[in-house]
A protein has these predicted regions:
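N-terminal leader/auxiliary helical segments
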Residues: 1-250
Length: 250
């Protein structure tokens, strides 16, 4: 699934296209919402609790629908304060981006039902692709500084029943910290540590050998996924997120 940095840069572009007053007034809360489904990294909750999508279900799912089904108090954006409405809009963007990635890229290319069969190498290839997409979208330092500043200055006056405010404040620190560390390849082995360990890639020498192979692995991964599939995913997911966010805030 897209890394936190990519979720925020995509959310920024969606905000520029939508020009919604609630988002413009509360950019920090909005960017926080765009990362918060991954708060389970902090809380250790089950993924489905915050993504409203079960990875073990292979029938069609709609995370945004489940969000409002389980949290009906959030359905009416006009009844919420601007920060909460902006937060939920960002949250919607994350759910859509993840859901489309799972269904359009991970499962058909890397998952159990794919030719790669969901093995450890497939999951490393998936992480390599995610990292590269994040790296490309975060090359503009001015854009990243803008997002980081909005996040850091947000009052986090957000009220959602399924996540406490103190947890959101702690998560905000983590989100800001993510943007403080550019996604350079030297950092990849730390971010993908458990996947490398599962493949038996451990120790300084083992990691060094693997990192030397990353450029070739990235090329192989992009060839397998296909440029068109990547482009269609990014444009299609953004279009769906934009539509659902507009419906929510209108």
């Amino acid at each position: 699934m897209p890394p936190l940095g990519l979720h925020m840069t995509v959310a920024r572009e969606l905000a520029r296209e939508l020009e919604q007053p609630a988002i413009e007034a509360e950019r920090g809360a909005y960017y926080l919402g765009a990362t918060t489904p991954d708060i389970r990294i902090l809380t250790r909750w089950d993924r489905a609790r915050t993504h409203f999508f079960d990875l073990n279900e292979f029938e069609e799912q709609n995370g945004v629908h489940r969000l409002f089904e389980q949290e009906p108090a959030l359905r009416d954006a006009a009844a919420l304060n601007p920060a909460t409405a902006a937060f939920v809009a960002g949250y919607i963007s994350h759910l859509v981006m993840d859901e489309r990635y799972i269904c359009e890229i991970y499962r058909p290319v890397f998952g159990i039902g794919s030719e790669l069969g969901g093995d450890v190498r497939a999951n490393i290839m998936d992480r390599v692709l995610q990292f590269e997409l994040d790296r490309r979208d975060r090359e503009d330092e001015e854009k990243i500084d803008e997002i980081r500043k909005a996040l850091a200055e947000s009052a986090v006056e957000v009220s959602v029943g399924f996540i406490a405010r103190d947890q959101l404040l702690e998560w905000r620190k983590i989100s800001v910290d993510v943007l403080s560390h550019p996604p350079i390849w030297d950092r990849f082995h730390r971010l993908a540590g458990r996947y490398l360990a599962a493949a038996g890639i451990e120790g300084e020498a083992g990691v060094a050998r693997f990192m030397n192979e990353v450029p070739a692995l990235l090329r192989t991964t992009i060839e397998r996924v296909g440029i068109d599939r990547i482009r269609d995913y990014l444009s299609g997911a953004s279009a769906e997120a934009r539509r659902k966010m507009k419906e929510y805030l209108s």
